[in-house]
Amino acid sequence: MSQVNMRDMLKAGVHFGHQTRYWNPKMGKYIFGARNKIHIINLEKTLPMFNDALSFVERLAQGKNKIMFVGTKRSAGKIVAEQAARCGSPYVDHRWLGGMLTNYKTIRASIKRLRDLETQAEDGTFAKLTKKEALMRSRDLEKLDRSLGGIKDMGGLPDALFVIDVDHERIAITEANKLGIPVIGVVDTNSSPEGVDYIIPGNDDAIRAIELYMTSMADAVIRGRNNVAGGTEVYAEEAAAPAAE
């Protein structure tokens, strides 16, 4: 099992939190101190928590479970899409649609519409339509793909969520909590860790930090899939550990 080390996190700037005036007291126990009015995250706390989260994801993947990657803010979206695609995991990189988990039946109908439009675009149906109708369907396809393209192959609810910036993705976390889906989240000094089962205290803005989180998580999924046990599968409810402190 490959693990992240302290040097990786320092190089990526994981330890840089937000300005001290924006801090959330619930993150106090993960803060080492402050420098130039910026909170410094205690990486001695982050390191084992990050590696625990990676181990959890690897166990889930080994049991053929699905981990959904969620990161819709500008600094995260591209990296989330790239790394999720690399490990064959579902992802949301543009905008979280309300009900994506709690109203999955409706979402599934939209995914079917997306697939139908993709088929029409490929089999020449669009070419047989009027220019106006073809344009309308092309726009519909583009819009649906941007919103749902990352989850069109999910085939059901995910077994866990990995979230970059828990404040920004609070709706996703609330939906997962309602359904009992475990949440792994990068939590910065200005955020609330509530509703997060596996907390990773760290910088949720720096691109290098986001790359480290996402690459490590994708690697964990790939390792798990490559080590699928012959007989024993680990299911989400069995692998889920108690909520982090």
Curated annotation (Swiss-Prot):
Q: Which domain of life is it from?
A: Bacteria
A GO MF annotation of the entry reads: structural constituent of ribosome
A Pfam family recorded for this sequence: Ribosomal_S2
Gene Ontology CC: one annotated term: cytosolic small ribosomal subunit
> Would you kindly state one Gene Ontology biological process term found in this protein's UniProt entry?
translation
What are the UniProt keywords, alphabetically?
Ribonucleoprotein, Ribosomal protein
Q: Extract the HAMAP family matched here.
A: Ribosomal_uS2_B
Q: Which PANTHER family match?
A: 30S RIBOSOMAL PROTEIN S2 PROKARYOTIC AND ORGANELLAR (PTHR12534), SMALL RIBOSOMAL SUBUNIT PROTEIN US2M (PTHR12534:SF0)
Query: In which family does this protein belong, per the annotation?
Result: Belongs to the universal ribosomal protein uS2 family.
In Swiss-Prot or TrEMBL terms, this protein is called Small ribosomal subunit protein uS2
Gene source species = Pseudomonas putida (strain W619)
Q: Which gene encodes it?
A: rpsB
